[in-house]
Amino acid sequence: MDSPSNATVPCGFLLQGFSEFPHLRPVLFLLLLGVHLATLGGNLLILVAVASMPSRQPMLLFLCQLSAIELCYTLVVVPRSLVDLSTPGHRRGSPISFLSCAFQMQMFVALGGAECFLLAAMAYDRYVAICHPLRYAAVVTPGLCARLALACCLRGLAVSVGLTVAIFHLPFCGSRLLLHFFCDITALLHLACTRSYADELPLLGACLVLLLLPSVLILASYGAIAAALRRLRCPKGRGKAASTCALHLAVTFLHYGCATFMYVRPRASYSPRLDRTLALVYTNVTPLLCPLIYSLRNREITAALSRVLGRRRPGQAPGGDLREL
């Protein structure tokens, strides 16, 4: 008799998920559900708060896009994982069709790539705001923000389509059991019949475009910011700006660090359990923390959130300094 991984899904795959840990399924379900609801609520609240502002600074377009990306990002992966964890019949793996798997991978890469470019654009915004404050309004215009936001999405989409086509043109034979809880690139590469380094070239190219180039821009922007802060004579202002940038960098490194460790390594070092652990952080913790930290360090956003929640303090002035973002 054929094994389930070979015979039950002839035109698709089986997502193993966390089926080898049946005793942890209820705990994982409750934990993921709580984080997922917090992520949805936090990002939706940011979108509503920005939409409620009578006048919005151009940079807030980036924040709205970041929240929207994280919202979609978590919806691509987490709901299906929750269903799989709550379904007793999926103890050996959850079936997913070939096209559904390709679509999930493409959307995951597109949204993740758009976020990588967006974080670089936001780093450039902070560079202009801190290093050239008098020219900020002339440089960072609503038109520039809109063009950068659109470019981030289009570049992420272009890379994701090319990578998805390359991965799903590989021959898959033998077991169709994906050792992951979603259709991840490394898990799919592990199932490919061939073991040529050429199979990994599309992933390497995508990593160069999505990870290396934006990270260089981010490091250059923050390097210039650090140099400018050292020349700042006001200790209070320098400390406040430095703490804000440190938080932004921490979230950025969490995003890039997980992605780099997961994808910038040879196929021979593939570790399913480690990849799934990192993916849990990458798909659940980062979408929760990233928009909140970027938003709550800005007075304009916190004032809008207070208005939405009905907790605005008497005498609290709306608006704030963009350099706090």
UniProtKB/Swiss-Prot annotation:
Q: What is this protein called?
A: Olfactory receptor 10AC1
InterPro entries from the UniProt entry: GPCR_Rhodpsn, GPCR_Rhodpsn_7TM, Olfact_rcpt
Q: Which keywords are on file for this protein?
A: Cell membrane, G-protein coupled receptor, Glycoprotein, Membrane, Olfaction, Receptor, Sensory transduction, Transducer, Transmembrane, Transmembrane helix
MF terms in GO? G protein-coupled receptor activity; olfactory receptor activity
Query: Extracellular compartment: which residues?
Result: 1-26, 79-101, 169-171, 222-243
Q: Which CDD domains match?
A: 7tmA_OR10A-like
Segments on the Cytoplasmic side according to the record's topology features: 48-57, 123-147, 193-200, 265-325
The subcellular localization recorded is: Cell membrane
Asked if Chloroplast is a keyword of the record, the answer is: no
Alphabetical list of Pfam families matching this protein: 7tm_4
Write out the similarity annotation. Answer: Belongs to the G-protein coupled receptor 1 family.
Identify its membrane topology class.
Multi-pass membrane protein
Where do the record's glycosylation annotations fall on this chain? N6
Q: Name one GO biological process term.
A: detection of chemical stimulus involved in sensory perception of smell
Q: What does this protein do?
A: Odorant receptor.
- Which SUPFAM superfamilies does the entry link to? Family A G protein-coupled receptor-like
Instruction: Note the superkingdom of the native organism.
Output: Eukaryota
One GO cellular-component annotation of the UniProt record comes to: plasma membrane
